[in-house]
């Protein structure tokens, strides 16, 4: 199995207040070259509900609400989009990313991202684990995801 390198840059600027970290982009996200691109992933739907707006330009939405997006993993082996299959992990330099920003809190989307963050990343910013919005976590109702992610909206104020 060959190593796959994360194919696109973080969404971040100096005014970012929160950083949302996934594990590694899905096959569809890698093809579409942006975060949470699989239409079955509920991340963007949750954001629309929390911020009470339709999101047409995802990157502009993130900048407008001071949200940075990235993934913990810089490169890895992976089968399809399954976090369970991830191996040979190299992590992104998250501490350097947030140096010249207003980021005061980091959220991870799912257990794998949180576990890898805790294991590999040395950063003084508080981190909060949130449930995965992936279709692999379909048992979690949309209302429950929105409730769990409310802290993101509150942290963007």
Question: Residue spans of the language-model regions?
Answer:
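A polyanion-binding, active-site-adjacent surface
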Residues: 2-105, 111-116, 120, 124-138, ...
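A polyampholytic, Gly/Pro-enriched intrinsically disordered region
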Residues: 146-157
């Amino acid at each position: 199995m060959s190593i796959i390198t994360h194919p696109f840059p973080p969404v971040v600027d100096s005014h970012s207040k929160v950083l949302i970290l996934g594990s590694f982009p899905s096959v569809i996200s890698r093809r579409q070259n942006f975060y949470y691109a699989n239409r079955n992933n509920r991340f963007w739907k949750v954001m629309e509900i929390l911020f009470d707006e339709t999101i047409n330009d995802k990157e502009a939405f993130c900048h407008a609400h001071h949200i940075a997006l990235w993934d913990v993993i810089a490169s890895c082996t992976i089968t399809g989009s399954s976090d369970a299959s991830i191996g040979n992990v190299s992590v992104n330099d998250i501490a350097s990313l947030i140096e010249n920003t207003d980021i005061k809190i980091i959220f991870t989307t799912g257990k794998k991202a949180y576990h890898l963050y805790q294991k590999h990343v040395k950063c003084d910013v508080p981190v909060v684990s949130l449930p995965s919005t992936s279709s692999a976590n379909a048992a979690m109702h949309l209302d429950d995801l929105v409730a769990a992610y409310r802290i993101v909206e509150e942290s963007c104020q």
